[in-house]
Amino acid sequence: MLCWLPVVLQAEVSPELLNGYRNGAESKVVYRVVDDEGNAVSNATAEIWYRSYGRPQDNAHWKTQTNRDGEFVAQHRTNERLSVAVRKDGYYSCRDVVSYFDIKKNSVVDGRWQPFGEKRTLVMKRMLKPVRLDFHDGLDYKKVPEYGVWLGFDLQLFDFTSPYGRGRSDDVLLLFTLIKGKDYLATIEMSFTNNVQAGCYRLKKDMYSGLKTVYRADPFAHYEDSVKFSYVRKFGNPPVSESLGEDEYLVFRTRTKVDEDGDLISGHYGIIEGPLSFVGPGGLSVDCCLFNPVEKDTNLEVMRK
């Protein structure tokens, strides 16, 4: 018996579901691949993996092509998971995972995982106009030089400005607070108020895609001039974090110029990808920071090679 089956046996599950976890059940998913405008993507290469826990004989891996309607089928026996990845020149890859490892969400009927023959749509974003952006990844940690005071931060160089770093432009002001003791509280406030009409807005990543963020910044979006994130750990309770999550990012505008009426003339645009970390000795880090060095250019489709 598989090591996790005693846990399943303690739950109220049907005999068919239990047998599906013991001996596997047939999975079938019909995929349709479309581009970001909804057009079918034919002749794309779909790579399919079936993984079974404790049943290596059911593991499988193969490749196929999407047909003229952008469709392909994944079908095999499993007790755990289906993973697919789709690639084609001129497009960003996309992926999907179907997990059968949840007794509350899954069911088996006649030896088949339900819904058998489920239809799913995958979106392959087109490569439009990738450009070279200044790029800093999550390995670039910045120790917090001082708490309780506003610190200038250069988003292009991803560093504090003088006297704490090599940054040259106060693209955003950062305020860190830290309270240690029986309870622990850490906050970071990001303010763009030193640049008129600068700010940021928050979006969800397209986690399925090789391009998880937007192609371009929206110059007409509502840009918040400040945002605040916190981490609280009260004695005897689990920590509570209100931060930029792994599946989120900020689109920002800074180094703005306005006319005599206060109307926007130009600015620089970029992206801060979560997760945002500002707790602990490591200091400040993000998944990555992108900065378009070309004034007025809203293009954020980064050329990563």
Question: At which residue positions do the language-model features occur?
Answer:
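Short beta-strand/loop motifs in extracellular/secreted proteins, especially
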Residues: 29, 42-46, 82, 186
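A short, amphipathic beta-strand motif
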Residues: 27-38, 46, 70-72, 122, ...
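A short, solvent-exposed loop/turn motif at the edges and junctions
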Residues: 54, 77-107
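Surface-exposed, beta-sheet-biased, low-hydrophobicity segments with strongly acidic/polar composition
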Residues: 107-109, 114-118, 123-305
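Hydrophobic beta-strand segments
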Residues: 44-51, 99
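Short, acidic Ser/Thr/Gly-rich low-complexity loop/linker segments typical of extracellular
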Residues: 40-41, 52-76
